[in-house]
């Protein structure tokens, strides 16, 4: 019986982690390709510097997760990417807590690009 409870808790935990953040728009990598040259958006890659150097998109500024996002302009849309979508989701949460209104997460990250 306790094994089933543990399994249920693990499933609920991972389901919760995968849920989109309230107030954060999610786009696919195909949608990203259509907006990459939009000068009204700020593109942020939250992977490590090494990951970014190995395979980064030139439109994205590398600001690793855990860095200070408060210097980004709050009047522009912030589009966030990472390797798989998990770190970018965390960064989107941080941006929302800092008062950013227009935040977009790229689903699947660079792995899907």
Regions found by a protein language model. Give the residues of each.
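Flexible, polar/low-complexity N-terminal or interdomain linker segments that lie immediately upstream
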Residues: 1-42, 46-53
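Residues at secondary-structure transition points
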Residues: 27, 56-58, 86, 90
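Hydrophobic residues at beta-strand termini and immediately following loops
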Residues: 27, 63, 106
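A generic structural signal for secondary-structure junctions
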Residues: 37, 56-57, 111
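Short loop/helix-cap segments at secondary-structure boundaries that form the rim of catalytic
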Residues: 52-58, 70-74
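A short alpha/beta connector and helix-capping loop motif
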Residues: 58-65
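Catalytic cysteine-centered active loop of the rhodanese-like fold, especially the PTP/DSP P-loop
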Residues: 67-113
């Amino acid at each position: 019986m306790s094994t089933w409870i543990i399994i249920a808790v693990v499933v609920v935990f991972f389901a919760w982690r995968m849920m989109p953040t309230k107030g954060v728009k999610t786009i696919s990598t195909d949608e990203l390709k259509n907006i990459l040259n939009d000068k009204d958006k700020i593109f942020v890659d939250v992977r490590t510097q090494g990951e970014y150097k190995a395979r980064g998109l030139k439109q994205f500024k590398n600001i690793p997760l855990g860095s200070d996002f408060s210097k980004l302009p709050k009047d522009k849309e912030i589009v966030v990417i990472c390797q798989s979508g998990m770190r970018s989701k965390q960064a989107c949460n941080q941006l929302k807590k800092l008062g950013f209104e227009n935040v977009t997460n790229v689903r699947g990250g660079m792995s899907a690009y």
